[in-house]
Regions:
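C-terminal (or distal) subdomains of carbohydrate-active enzymes
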Residues: 1-172
Length: 172
């Protein structure tokens, strides 16, 4: 069976995307991947209203590095962001999407991470859970979902200009 997304696109200085879909899958990760020309070693993202530079090993594969001893958490190529992440001159501004991943020459933004248990004791990336397992069935985000983001070609030093295009400043 084939599934499709409807993607609305508009172009100004940024290309704006709005993706609407009906999520019927539990415990699933939805991402949009941006394939860049080179392996992604460095990203710049907005965190706490400033730009953070992060270094990555683009060839790191968590599945090949799962911890064998208790109390160890596997390194990951996922990172948080507020509204912006960029690499190699590509900038992505999101509305409420706060996680991205680096792997090889791709920069992926998480559209939806549907989960049913927080601190799942069966998570292979953690040999010891972060806390007691908590069931959160609504975190599966079943049903209609909308993800919005904008993409442009700009340097990290210009990110505020482009963030303002998506989130105009309000003067009181």
């Amino acid at each position: 069976k084939t599934s499709f997304f409807d993607v609305s696109v508009s172009f100004h200085e940024l290309i704006n995307f709005s993706i609407k879909w009906n999520n019927t899958l539990k415990n699933h990760l939805w991402q949009v991947r941006f394939i860049l020309p080179e392996p992604v070693h460095t990203t710049f993202s907005e965190d706490m209203n400033t730009i953070i530079e992060r270094k990555f090993n683009p060839f790191y594969d968590i599945r090949k590095n799962l911890p064998k001893k208790r109390g160890i958490e596997a390194k990951t190529n996922f990172a948080p962001m507020q509204r912006y992440v960029g690499a190699q001159g590509v900038g992505i501004i999101t509305k409420g999407l706060t996680e991205y991943e680096v792997f090889e020459n791709t920069l992926s933004v998480t559209l939806l991470r549907s989960v049913g248990v927080i601190s799942n004791p069966k998570n292979p990336a953690r040999s010891t859970p972060a806390g007691p397992p908590l069931e959160v069935p609504d975190a599966q985000q079943l049903g209609e979902n909308i993800a919005e983001f904008s993409v442009g070609f700009f340097d990290k030093d210009d990110y505020e200009k482009f963030v303002t295009l998506v989130f105009p400043k309000i003067v009181l």
